[in-house]
Amino acid sequence: MSEQTIRTRFAPSPTGYLHVGGLRTALYNFLFAKKNGGQFLLRLEDTDRARLVEGAVENLLSSLEWAGIIPDESPKHGGDFGPYVQSERLDIYKQYVQQLLDEKKAYYCFATPDELEESRQLQIKQGVQPKYNRKWLPEDMGGSMPQSEIQKRLDAGEPCVIRMKIPDHTRIRHDDIIRGIVWFDSSTVDDQVLMKSDGFPTYHLASVVDDHLMNITHVIRGEEWLSSTPKHLLLYDFFGWEKPEFAHLPLLLNPDRSKLSKRQGDVAVEDYMAKGYSKDALVNFVALLGWNEGEGVEQEVYSMNELIEKFTLEKVGKSGAVFNVEKLNWIQKQHLKLVSHEDLAKQAKAILVEKLKERESMMPSEKITDDAYLLNVVELMHDRVNFVHEFVTFSEYFFFEPEAYEEAAIKKRWKENTNDLLSEFKGILAGLDNFNSAAIEEALAKYAELKGVKNAALIHPIRLAVSGVSFGPSLYHLMEVIGKEACLRRIERAVDKLDYQEA
């Protein structure tokens, strides 16, 4: 292509949620444009009216904005090449399809759905690839249908579609940035419908016209569009337009290497947003679904700026990319480590405040929502959580009394003498002037020695009493953060509620 500003586009259909595959397509287009000092635009391809879903446009836009993929031009942001919604460009498509009709590169087809299906079934029975039988190809284009019959139907206002005429006995060469040279035989390509009977164009016509008029230099899209590429290349030739460069991205696969589908897990960006994945982690993970820097580079954690700096289409592979949630979780944890404790405490506070609207705490709300208190929680739990919300949900005991106790831990840790030991030790804790981890640890060790028991005979049941679970951070630090009053209250409550259970 001649030297010009790089322009890429993401052109989704507003038929539902933003799929993670769509996020990857948008991201790669965004990264490539930004890496090369170009522009990235968002275009809505809403010509399939039967599949439109209310609210899908808003969902697409909000998901992309959440991910930090901000278009330079879009229905929301405007631009010099609008409208950016295909249903608002119908007159443009009619103009270009008329040009193809006038130049005998397209023709009217009045075949009914039943006729098309009957022909398709016959071809399958004959063992040939189903394609349109060209019944309505006019005589002056090499077919057998008289122009008079076509005109009669047009004059009567009968519903029809407009099809492109695929050249016979032609080999079509496609140079793909990712896949190299791919050849297509025109005998395998159907006379594609360009304009439907409702006056709306199909994807094939609209996308080619729009990409040309919007000066798109690179079409980066999923592998599923590779088989349609010969039709698009022919349309560029029909119109005499310079072709953009194409790059077809590898399929996304489930761990069993089947095509990624909702049956085996979440596929919507909003699902991962709801689960608490950060935008940095999800973008990082999605970027690695097909792309890497190459051999010898061990880096796997990237910021958006680093991705822009390092991304190239030449490093995108051809083979399918496995969507591994374990890898996503690892990347999520790495990104969490990069966030300051202060910022994490602020984010956790917002979650806790919402939680307190639904659930009452016996601890003073001004204490547990205090910045210093939350910072202590974050510092204690930072290495134990993967998501910001887990500072609240996984660590509820910092904010709420245990409502239940881990059953297996009761059977294993609550001995015949546990209630007596805890009741007495509670009095020792109450007498501590400095309720810090060192003082608590020292008091427990002395009391255990006095009673002739191992420290564990106190540590495990106290942890259960204070937190309701058998795992967590250092008990002494946990108790220090929660504070004397809450610890004493929880130990007393557990002694009242729990008893030794014989095996």
UniProtKB/Swiss-Prot annotation:
GO terms for biological process: glutamyl-tRNA aminoacylation. The keyword Ribosomal protein does not apply. A motif ('HIGH' region) lies at residues 12-22. One of its GO terms (molecular function) is zinc ion binding. CDD domains: GluRS_core (cd00808). A motif ('KMSKS' region) lies at residues 259-263. It catalyses: tRNA(Glu) + L-glutamate + ATP = L-glutamyl-tRNA(Glu) + AMP + diphosphate. Its EC number is 6.1.1.17. Pfam families: Anticodon_2, tRNA-synt_1c. The keyword Signal does not apply. GO terms for cellular component: cytoplasm. Keywords: Aminoacyl-tRNA synthetase, ATP-binding, Cytoplasm, Ligase, Nucleotide-binding, Protein biosynthesis. ATP binds at K262. Its main location: cytoplasm. It comes from the Bacteria. It is found in: Cytoplasm. PANTHER family: GLUTAMATE--TRNA LIGASE, GLUTAMATE--TRNA LIGASE, MITOCHONDRIAL-RELATED. Monomer. Belongs to the class-I aminoacyl-tRNA synthetase family. Glutamate--tRNA ligase type 1 subfamily. Catalyzes the attachment of glutamate to tRNA(Glu) in a two-step reaction: glutamate is first activated by ATP to form Glu-AMP and then transferred to the acceptor end of tRNA(Glu). This is Glutamate--tRNA ligase. It comes from Chloroherpeton thalassium (strain ATCC 35110 / GB-78). The lineage of its organism: Bacteria, Pseudomonadati, Chlorobiota, Chlorobiia, Chlorobiales.
